[in-house]
Structures are given as structure tokens and as C-alpha cells.
């Protein structure tokens, strides 16, 4: 089975595998590096929002209303999104879910993790998603490094980690590289860099730090708008 990952820039990813399409942090309008419009992407079955900041909520409400996709978020952020126009029936689990909880949607299993950041509502979170074919990825959201990443790496065989490296508001390259080791991630795609001048502008330092802290973790360098296809039998994924 193959998994297709598309990076729309910043923390905005689509992951399609086993017939299910998951979109995370759909920041299109106002995203200076987004290569597509929100209404021109492949239809998602599920939209996940990591926290209530404009560059992560993005066009989640518009996309869900246009496609009927469910929206997954932490309890507390659901009310803010419904107030902003999201139909309540499109909220995954009716009211959202919470850290440590697992829900199912479109054949995928989604577990919510903690994140260390800020949010206008609810709390910031990350997600570990196991697709219908077993491919498992972790989207960290905006976060600093935290020691409990090691526990998530013991609980789940993470085929792919999507980690912020931009610094200032999140982990920097050194912290993100050590996070790969804690998570025991088989591969990593860096995110939350290059979007704005205040962030890390390339992945050079991350590549160097990864060689020091997690040399067995495979780095996939992507550019906004690029898609990557992983074959689990060739990549050595656990699933």
C-alpha cells in the first residue's frame, strides 16, 4: 500500500492512505507559501486542527462546510468554531475529544497528544493518526520538545513524524532532531519553517542535528505544494 503526503506549506498537510484523506491545519488564505487554493485540493474525509490560531485553523470551517468532512479538535475549541459558523454535526464526536483520547473517522484512528504552546480556545494538541492500512503518522502541531514524546514512541510505531523546526514559537532544529529520537520515528518531514522571516528559513541545521541525534531517522525535505509517495514495503514501515 502507498501513502501520499502533500505539504501545503507551514503546518498544512494532507495524508492519503488506504482510501482515506486527512487534512491537518489547513492554512491557505494568507499563507505566503501555499501553492494551492483551499477549494482546489483533494477532498478530505477529515480535517484536524491542532490549536486555535489563525495560521492553523485557516480555512477549516469553509472546507468542512463545502465537503462535509468532519472536523477534529480539542474540547473547548469546538465551541469557538461552531460560533464561527461550523455546523455542530460536522464536529468529530459531537464536541471534539481530548488528550489521550482516541476516536475513529473514515477508517482512521486518531489519538490526541499534548503540545506545549498557546491557543485562543481549548488547549494546543498534536495527533497520532493510524490510517486504515496501518500507516501511522504524528503531527506535533506547534510545540516545544517534551519528555513524554518518548512514551508516545513506545505506545505507537511512528512511520512518519511531522515536526516544527522554525524556532521562536516552536521547537528549533536541535530540539526537533532530539524529538525524532524520543519518538523513535522512522522518518520525518520538517514543518513550520520558511513561512515568515522570523522562522528558520531552511532545513540545513535540522539535517545536521538529525545526523547527531537520530541518524536512523530518514529525512524527507519537501517544498510547499510538493507531494511525496511512500511505499510501506520499500520504506520499512512497521505497519
From Swiss-Prot:
Q: What is the superkingdom listed in this entry's lineage?
A: Bacteria
Residues crossing the lipid bilayer are none
Q: Name one GO molecular function term.
A: hydrolase activity
Gene3D superfamilies per UniProt: Ribonuclease Z/Hydroxyacylglutathione hydrolase-like
Keyword flag Hydrolase: yes
What are the entry keywords? Hydrolase
- Which InterPro entries does the record cross-reference, listed alphabetically? Metallo-B-lactamas, RibonucZ/Hydroxyglut_hydro, UPF0173, UPF0173_UPF0282_UlaG_hydrolase
Read off the NCBIfam families from this record: PRK00685.1
The text of the family note is: Belongs to the UPF0173 family.
**Protein name per the record:** UPF0173 metal-dependent hydrolase DVU_3308
- Species assigned in the record: Nitratidesulfovibrio vulgaris (strain ATCC 29579 / DSM 644 / CCUG 34227 / NCIMB 8303 / VKM B-1760 / Hildenborough) (Desulfovibrio vulgaris)
